[in-house]
Regions:
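Gram-negative bacterial Sec-dependent N-terminal signal peptides
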Residues: 9-17
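Bacterial N-terminal signal peptides that target proteins for export
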Residues: 1-10
Length: 157
C-alpha cells in the first residue's frame, strides 16, 4: 500500500497541473483581449487634440489608426484563440475568420464611399498624409467592431 500512495501523488499533481494550465490559458486569452479592448477604448474621443496644423493632425490620425489596428489585431487574435480553447474543434474560430473577411471588405468600402461625400477640400485632400475623413472612418469602424465582438462573444471573453 505504501508504494502505491507515493506513485499516486505525482499522478494527481500532474492531472491537477494540466487542468489548471487549461484554465490559465483560457483566462490568459480573456486577459489579452480585455487589455487590448481597454487600451483602444481609452483613446476614444481625444484623438489628436494637440495637433495644431493639418499636417500634424493627419500624421497623428494615421498613427492613431495604426495603434487602433494593433489593438484590434491583439483583441481579435485572443478572441480567436479563446474560441479554439473553448470548443472541441476549430469550427467556431473558422466561422469568425469568415465574418472577418467580409467585415474588412465592408470597412474599406464604407469608408471609401463616405469620403466621396467630401468631393473637394482639405478634409478629403489634406495632402500627402492621406485623407483625414477616411482615416477617422477606419478608426471609428474598427472600434465599433471591437465593441460588437466583445458584446457578441461575451460568454467566451
Amino acid at each position: 500500500m505504501k508504494t502505491r500512495a507515493p506513485a499516486a501523488i505525482p499522478l494527481l499533481l500532474l492531472v491537477l497541473s494540466y487542468t489548471m494550465s487549461g484554465s490559465a490559458q483560457n483566462g490568459k486569452q480573456q486577459h489579452i483581449a480585455d487589455l487590448a479592448y481597454q487600451a483602444e477604448m481609452a483613446h476614444e474621443g481625444g484623438e489628436c487634440a494637440d495637433a495644431l496644423t493639418l499636417v500634424d493632425r493627419n500624421e497623428c490620425l494615421n498613427d492613431m489608426r495604426i495603434e487602433t489596428y494593433k489593438n484590434y489585431t491583439k483583441f481579435f487574435d485572443a478572441l480567436r484563440e479563446a474560441l479554439i480553447q473553448a470548443s472541441p474543434n476549430d469550427s467556431n474560430a473558422l466561422a469568425l475568420d469568415g465574418t472577418e473577411l467580409v467585415w474588412e471588405k465592408y470597412r474599406v468600402t464604407a469608408c471609401d464611399a463616405m469620403v466621396r461625400v467630401y468631393d473637394m477640400g482639405t478634409i478629403k485632400h489634406p495632402g500627402p498624409s492621406g485623407p483625414s475623413a477616411q482615416t477617422r472612418c477606419l478608426i471609428q469602424l474598427t472600434r465599433s467592431r471591437m465593441r460588437d465582438l466583445k458584446q457578441l462573444y461575451e460568454p467566451t471573453l
